[in-house]
């Protein structure tokens, strides 16, 4: 990923599904995206609180695609997210929401049926850690790693992914060329 921070516009968005939908439809934002050749649009906004909890980020995603990465034209419209700058670790939230944009889902324990691939999900080990796409509280920990699930890496002897079960790194390798050609 490359960050070109000079292409910034001020907004007052909060992390909500309604605001993500308005981003998709906003012709000015689409024009800026085209003008700056942005593969993704990330809006730094604020958290959305409700009786169900606090939403620190929200993203367009392609869950449940049954191991078929959609063609360029269909998928590129999902490449928007809102990340709150007033809610937890903004960097991890930013990475998590981009993970959704790139076809990754939460952990199997959270009920994820995968992202673009059935195994494109987060991973965690009870009382030890959770990877970027997994919620740490589901694994009784506060230790969220700044890694996507990857069976090729280990932390204190524990693999941070499982082949064909939780391997976000492999999924990202497979979708890289499609994403790079969005703009």
Segments and roles (model prediction):
Residues 1-183:
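Extracellular (secreted or membrane-anchored) zinc-dependent metallopeptidases
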